[in-house]
Amino acid sequence: MLRTRLNFFDACVGTAVEYVRDEWPDELADVRFEVAAVPSGEPGPLGVDRWRVSTRERRIVLYRLPIERLAHLHKDDEWHRRSFIESCVFRAVAELLGKDPWDIAPERYRHF
């Protein structure tokens, strides 16, 4: 099977979501995770969003193209790309739960 960037991104998000759901089952039981290509609307004051969190809707949307294209990795290989995508999932979950990303995934969170 041909492995595309889209498949790779979805797989990385899926494994990261599975990990955080295992770590925080009660807190994330009703949270919806979605992937979209880009955020709608104009960039905010901090630039292009990588994700959007809605606490009211219990929803996290990760934006694939900004995450992929605006990552400034010191080494552009599969491990670093996967780690960066996972870190975005962990930071979005931390934002939703009002916690620090290191608390969300102490064994896997890597700051980029």
Regions picked out by a protein language model, each given a short descriptive name:
Residues 89:
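A conserved beta-strand element that flanks and buttresses the S-adenosyl-L-methionine
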